[in-house]
Swiss-Prot record:
It comes from the Archaea. This is UPF0111 protein PH0637. It comes from Pyrococcus horikoshii (strain ATCC 700860 / DSM 12428 / JCM 9974 / NBRC 100139 / OT-3). Belongs to the UPF0111 family. It holds the Pfam family PhoU_div. Disulfide bonds: none annotated.
């Protein structure tokens, strides 16, 4: 009950400050996934397993915050944006952490990576680094949206927001390119079908991180135009 009152006070001050707190945990989740990926590429399964567990724990925290925020937003709260818009954005932002957790689960499936070529591992690592960028940009975007609101929708602050949104879209496009390159390598290589399926699912869940980041950026664009 005490925590719910805290969230309500934050929502009363600004509808975006609680979302910023949730975004912080989302970023931590993806950052931890990158550490898991580094250990995975080195063949350090036990260390990777530790980081994968932390990813799962952080995703649980993000889910808990999401539930608390959802329960705290009531129709009685006076906010400059619709309750449904806040909830839709929160849902999309939370999906970023979900995608990170899905990736971590796939990493755990295979212990020995001797059959996975280094060029494939390198692309997966690049996708991981770009995913971090996407998550951090989402965090910057929701913080900037708060600045836009506090400035009374000043043109200078709006331009900053659109710049961040464009950066998110660019990162998502870059990851799509890496994903396509990876698929080409997998289908032209002599990988065992199980290894191919394993790699493609890691790539798919990694791509979902940037896809969900782009979705949140689009939601921010909608909020800006309302």
């Amino acid at each position: 009950m005490i925590k719910m009152q805290v969230w309500k006070k934050l929502f009363a001050k600004s509808p975006f400050k609680p979302l910023i707190r949730h975004a912080e945990v989302v970023v931590q989740t993806v950052e931890t996934l990158e550490k898991a990926l580094d250990s995975w590429a080195r063949g350090d399964y036990e260390n990777m397993k530790e980081y994968a567990k932390k990813v799962d724990d952080l995703e649980d925290i993000a889910d808990k915050i999401k539930s608390e925020l959802r329960d705290s937003i009531t129709s009685k709260l006076l906010m400059p944006v619709q309750r449904t818009d806040i909830l839709e954005y929160l849902h999309m932002q939370d999906k970023i952490a979900d995608a990170a957790e899905d990736t971590a689960k796939w990493l755990l499936i295979k212990r020995n990576l001797d059959s996975i070529p280094n060029d494939i591992k390198d692309i997966i690592l690049k996708m991981g680094k770009e995913s971090i960028k996407a998550a951090k940009l989402v965090y910057e975007a929701i913080k900037q949206l708060d600045n836009v609101l506090e400035s009374g929708f000043a043109e200078k602050e709006i331009k900053k927001e659109y710049k961040i949104i464009k950066q998110i879209e660019e990162v998502e496009s870059k990851i799509d390119g890496l994903d396509s390159k990876l698929m080409e390598i997998v289908f032209t290589s002599e990988l065992d079908w199980k290894d191919g399926l394993y790699i493609l699912n890691i790539a798919r869940t990694l791509s979902n991180i940037s896809d969900k980041a782009k979705d949140t950026a689009e939601r921010i664009r909608v909020l800006m135009n309302k």
